[in-house]
């Protein structure tokens, strides 16, 4: 029995990619801890006041960079790990939302999805700048709530024979 409409399947697939050139570009962008941009020189002062730093300048353009937030850096590190492990179907961006139930509010944003030959990995990432203690009882409970529905959806799209594994990854939490 189909759980998703063709529109929902298309919406999920729009946030996934298996295009080698797109994956290579994404990998290069994600493996650096900095977000970089090329801007016109007349925009430079505004960006510098927002915490960006100037890397280089040419006649009309400036290259600037800013350290990515810790949560984005951690998600990027996990994404790159799966890419380095040979996974070639990965989420394109961090806007992948998967409907897991019948109600319209039964949707969950997924940080990293990696589809392999035999398995699909669904990763929820939590990171903090400074080491601190935390209990993730609420987050684990939420995963238990949507796990079965997300598994059904991913198997419907990528094949019933695939195993779906959930990972709760943390950085700087004890």
Q: Where do the protein language model's features map onto the residues?
A:
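Intrinsically disordered, low-complexity Ser/Thr/Pro/Gly-rich regulatory segments
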Residues: 1-174
């Amino acid at each position: 029995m189909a759980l998703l409409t063709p529109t929902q399947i298309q919406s999920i697939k729009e946030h996934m990619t298996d295009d080698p050139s797109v994956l290579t570009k994404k990998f290069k962008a994600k493996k650096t801890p900095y977000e970089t941009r090329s801007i016109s020189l007349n925009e430079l002062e505004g960006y510098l006041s927002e915490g960006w730093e100037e890397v280089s300048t040419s006649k009309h353009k400036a290259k600037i960079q800013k350290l990515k937030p810790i949560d984005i850096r951690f998600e990027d590190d996990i994404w790159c790990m799966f890419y380095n492990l040979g996974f070639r179907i990965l989420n394109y961006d961090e806007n992948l939302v998967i409907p897991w139930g019948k109600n319209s509010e039964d949707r969950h944003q997924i940080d990293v999805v990696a589809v392999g030959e035999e398995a699909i990995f669904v990763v929820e990432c939590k990171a903090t700048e400074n080491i601190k203690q935390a209990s993730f009882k609420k987050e684990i409970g939420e995963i238990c709530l949507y796990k079965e529905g997300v598994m059904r959806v991913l198997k419907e799209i990528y094949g019933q024979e695939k195993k779906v594994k959930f990972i709760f990854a943390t950085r700087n939490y004890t």
